[in-house]
Amino acid sequence: MTADPDFSDLTEREMAALIYRITDELSTRGTRAAFAELLQVVAYVGERVGVAARTLAASNSWSQVAEVSGTSKQAAWERWRS
C-alpha cells in the first residue's frame, strides 16, 4: 500500500468486514510470517478494544460498555478502565 486509505466514509460494519476478510486471508496462508503478523494483530486489537471501551465510557457511560460487551458495569470497568 502506497498511501493511507480514507476509511471515514465506511460504516462500522463495512470496516469490520474488511478486517474479517484480511484476518481470514492471514489465517489461511499457512506461513510463519502470516502467523506472526496475525499474533501481532491480535495484540493490537486487544489494546484498541480497551481504548474503544474507555472512549465509549467517557462519551456515554460504563453501563453502555457493559451492555455492548455483555458483562456487568463493574466487570467492564475493571477490565478496561486503564
Name every feature range the model reports, one short phrase each.
Residues 1-27:
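General nucleic-acid-binding
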Residues 28-51:
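Short, Lys/Arg-enriched anionic-surface-contact patches
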Residues 54-56:
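Short alpha-helical segment immediately N-terminal to, or the first helix within
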Residues 59-61:
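Residue-level signal for the short linker/turn that defines the boundary of a DNA-recognition helix
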Residues 65-66:
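The alpha-helix within a helix-turn-helix
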Residues 74:
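Key DNA-contact positions within bacterial/archaeal DNA-binding proteins
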Residues 77-78:
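Key DNA-contacting residues within the recognition helix of helix-turn-helix
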